[in-house]
Amino acid sequence: MNFKYIVAVSFLIASAYARSVQNDEQSLSQRDVLEEESLREIRGIGGKILSGLKTALKGAAKELASTYLHRKRTAEEHEVMKRLEAVMRDLDSLDYPEEASERETRGFNQDEIANLFTKKEKRILGPVLGLVGSALGGLIKKIG
């Protein structure tokens, strides 16, 4: 009788342990799924924000280009237009990153590629922020 009791208790302990392991695995997989879903949502929100920002920058750049287009330009304004055109090309290349990265990164190693994209981001944001700042400054001077 003791032997049957020991076997029964051992069986109950083993089945309880197996159920707890199975529950742990299910809860971990559910947590992984929830974390993955939340990361997707965050990426989606970030993508929408970047898309909106990119659209706004493109609109501002086009507006500045049309402002400078219909009048006689000085050498400084001509340089601003050249930088603005470069920014527009860079913004357009952001729409098709695969094609742009294929053209720009042939023959580079991974570190050089990372440095290239960091430099490209600085090259895009620097002139855009400068142009937007100077345009707003010019508008404020005209209004005031």
UniProtKB/Swiss-Prot annotation:
Its main location: secreted. This is Maximins 3/H11 type 1. One of its GO terms (biological process) is killing of cells of another organism. It is found in: Secreted. One of its GO terms (cellular component) is extracellular region. The modification Isoleucine amide is found at I143. The lineage of its organism: Eukaryota, Metazoa, Chordata, Craniata, Vertebrata. Keywords: Amidation, Amphibian defense peptide, Antibiotic, Antimicrobial, Cleavage on pair of basic residues, Cytolysis, Fungicide, Hemolysis, Secreted, Signal. Maximin-3 shows antibacterial activity against both Gram-positive and Gram-negative bacteria. It also shows antimicrobial activity against the fungus C.albicans, but not against A.flavus nor P.uticale. It has little hemolytic activity. It possess a significant cytotoxicity against tumor cell lines. It possess a significant anti-HIV activity. It shows high spermicidal activity. The keyword Signal applies. Expressed by the skin glands. InterPro entries: Bombinin. Residues 1-18 form the signal peptide. Residues 19-43, 73-122 form a propeptide. Belongs to the bombinin family. It comes from the Eukaryota.
